[in-house]
Amino acid sequence: MLIVADENIPLLDAFFEGFGEIRRYPGRSMDAASVKEADVLLVRSVTKVDRQLLEGSRVRFVGTCTIGTDHLDLDYFAEAGIHWSSAPGCNARGVVDYVLGSLLTLADLDGAALPQRTYGVVGAGEVGGRLVRVLHGMGWKVLVCDPLRQAAEGGDFVSLQTVLEQCDVISLHTPLQQGGEHPTWHLLGQAQLAQLRPGAWLINASRGPVVDNLALRELLLDREDVHAVLDVWEGEPQVDLQLADLCTLATPHIAGYSLDGRQRGTAQIYQALCRFLGEAERVQLQDLLPKPPLAQIEFDGEADLGWALATLCRAVYDPRRDDADFRRSLSDDAAEQRAAFDLLRKQYPPRREIEGLAVRLRGEAPQLVQMVNALGAVVV
């Protein structure tokens, strides 16, 4: 069996060497010649997998180590009898950690009290749903917009218009859909962005085209009160340099790039391939994950809640480092800038998740316990 894989997928040998030969290619440069002889194709979101890539090949299984599937032509897969699998939820926790770190940074700059803000989460799937649970667990006010879930479940969902009108913070976690009943391409365009509340914070860690980047650039030029955090960009790896400069935080599509999340994505695709082939799983992720460099943190029961929240979250992840690295990489030379974007992702340093952290509390601290539990860390 021949497996063709994106060279940046972690743990390829550990999970897949038992199936046969593995050939690695840069994800953005995979072409029909690269995959013609492959039986299995493993990709990330940077590879468009469609008829043009696969027609005439031997590929019968496509695995993407990502939550999103907008880079896969699922209609063609069905027509050609190609089995496929994604990795739902693999990096959800990493994205939540990114959002929390961004909120702390914005609060420092704005002087805003996080518990007193109203949060709007647009898209409540694997990532957005987990963020909603964390924010609710903190006791913060959250409005949720997800028309697909609303249609299926009913429940306490609101419209996008309500989010725009009532929320101080808007965090986007939708898939990218250009058609259908609920398209998300330019979900926030000029008209929607104009309705942002005074002093609003906008976070996009979903897909770049969910926000009209040109309209956002014009808004930020006109309104200094609005803070934008962008991890995803229209046309990436090409980036609108002026928009990046106007953003309060700007990063190169790494919100979900925790070590745990990336390796979890590989594990999920491995499990799917085992099911497809009818083979038993011989490798377990828990045997491959290294121990985190920080395993436990301790607080006094009298610790200030805001300080404890910032200390706990930033002990695991602080987006300001990624923002600084990204800004240093930006270049007026388009080719250099695209290469730097991909290099930052390829060489991204190991980053762990807050759920792997144990917290010891000295004395009675019910509010701290609630906060730690909401974040997903473990009180010991």
Swiss-Prot record:
CDD domains: ErythrP_dh (cd12158). It is found in: Cytoplasm. It catalyses: 4-phospho-D-erythronate + NAD(+) = (R)-3-hydroxy-2-oxo-4-phosphooxybutanoate + NADH + H(+). One of its GO terms (biological process) is 'de novo' pyridoxal 5'-phosphate biosynthetic process. One of its GO terms (cellular component) is cytosol. The active site is at R207, E236, H253 (proton donor). Its EC number is 1.1.1.290. One of its GO terms (molecular function) is NAD binding. The keyword Oxidoreductase applies. PROSITE patterns: D_2_HYDROXYACID_DH_3. Gene3D superfamilies: 3.30.1370.170, NAD(P)-binding Rossmann-like Domain (3.40.50.720). Keywords: Cytoplasm, NAD, Oxidoreductase, Pyridoxine biosynthesis. It comes from the Bacteria. Substrate binds at S45, T66, Y257. Its main location: cytoplasm. InterPro entries: D-isomer_2_OHA_DH_cat_dom (IPR006139), D-isomer_DH_CS (IPR029753), D-isomer_DH_NAD-bd (IPR006140), Erythronate-4-P_DHase (IPR020921), Erythronate-4-P_DHase_dimer (IPR024531), NAD(P)-bd_dom_sf (IPR036291), PdxB_dimer_sf (IPR038251). Belongs to the D-isomer specific 2-hydroxyacid dehydrogenase family. PdxB subfamily. Catalyzes the oxidation of erythronate-4-phosphate to 3-hydroxy-2-oxo-4-phosphonooxybutanoate. This is Erythronate-4-phosphate dehydrogenase. It comes from Pseudomonas putida (strain W619).
